[in-house]
Amino acid sequence: MSFTRQEPPRPVIAVVGPTGSGKSDLGVNLALALDGEVINADALQFYRGMDIGTAKITVEERRGVPHHLLDSMDVTQEASVADFQDECRAAINDIHSRGKRAILVGGSGLYVRAALDVLEFPGTDPTLRKELEEECENNGLAPLRARLEEVDPVSAARLGDARRVIRALEVHGLTGRPFSSFMPQREYFQPALQIGLEVDREQLRERLAVRVHRMVEGGLQQEVERLDAVGLRSGKTASRALGYAQFLKVLDGEMTADTAAEETIVATRQFARRQLTWFRADPRITWLGWQDPELVDKAVKVVNAAST
């Protein structure tokens, strides 16, 4: 009897790191080198029309590489990590079924974890949530926090604001399980590898400032005006995006464009620091220098080593 040797499944490749570090370019270069396709894991790049303010990769910059989950939502829609998980894993399966490499690119840490790791998303109970919100409004947060300490002390110690405490109690009421039991574990859902872009923090700070000024010069305010006309303000996710929230205030006469630009720079730098903290906590990531002239070659070697 003869047996056919089965090839091990190809790992999903994830390119991660802070905003402005060059993830999109590396993703395209890896796709060209490895016969792959890119899946977007930047929550704000899901939105059609949010191009300048998200530094969305252009059609020309994609260099013929197929990109999935870009421009897949209207600005009025709310982004959902659970929905993304389903859509991303479907895209991964589709890409792999055609013999291609799936390359996940993005800096939205929870979205990357949702795609790669074993991670459950509990449902919602609008009626229970409304009851909890009314209780919080009438009696304050303290009684709800005390209740959470009884059923889920881990979450009670970690969650500070009313919205998250209410969500934790909602999940417990819905599932009978503590909210903390749904937190992501560092266990891959399927074979995967992560490549992180190591940055010089001072250089990144300067790059982010230059990038925001270029966005403004490139028409960010006009982009916000166009999106405002199609419902940007009603979108819970899109309306809070860096740059967009600030320039909505410009449209309302609450601040000048110069002030909006400076506030966007500060907020973007803070966001980049949070991204670095998130990704640095994951020991599975292989870090490569963002400005290394041999970056692509080294990244390909990391992938090939993990695939043998």
From Swiss-Prot:
Q: Which UniProt keywords apply?
A: ATP-binding, Magnesium, Nucleotide-binding, Transferase, tRNA processing
This protein's record includes keyword Magnesium: yes
User: Where on this chain does ATP bind?
Assistant: 17-24
- Alphabetical list of InterPro entries matching this protein: Dimethylallyltransferase, IPT, P-loop_NTPase
Query: Per the record's keyword annotation, is ATP-binding included, yes or no?
Result: yes
Q: Which cofactor does it need?
A: Mg(2+)
The protein's Enzyme Commission number: 2.5.1.75
Spell out the residues of the site Interaction with substrate tRNA: 108, 129
On the tree of life, the source organism's domain of life is Bacteria
Binding, substrate:
19-24
Q: Name one Pfam family in it.
A: IPPT
**What biological-process terms (Gene Ontology) are attached?**
tRNA modification
| Reaction(s) catalysed by this chain's protein | adenosine(37) in tRNA + dimethylallyl diphosphate = N(6)-dimethylallyladenosine(37) in tRNA + diphosphate
Q: Which is one GO molecular function term here?
A: ATP binding
Function summary: Catalyzes the transfer of a dimethylallyl group onto the adenine at position 37 in tRNAs that read codons beginning with uridine, leading to the formation of N6-(dimethylallyl)adenosine (i(6)A).
HAMAP family, sorted: IPP_trans
Concerning PANTHER family, the annotation shows: TRNA DIMETHYLALLYLTRANSFERASE
| Family named by the database record | Belongs to the IPP transferase family.
Which proteins does it associate with, and in what oligomeric form? Monomer.
This protein is called: tRNA dimethylallyltransferase
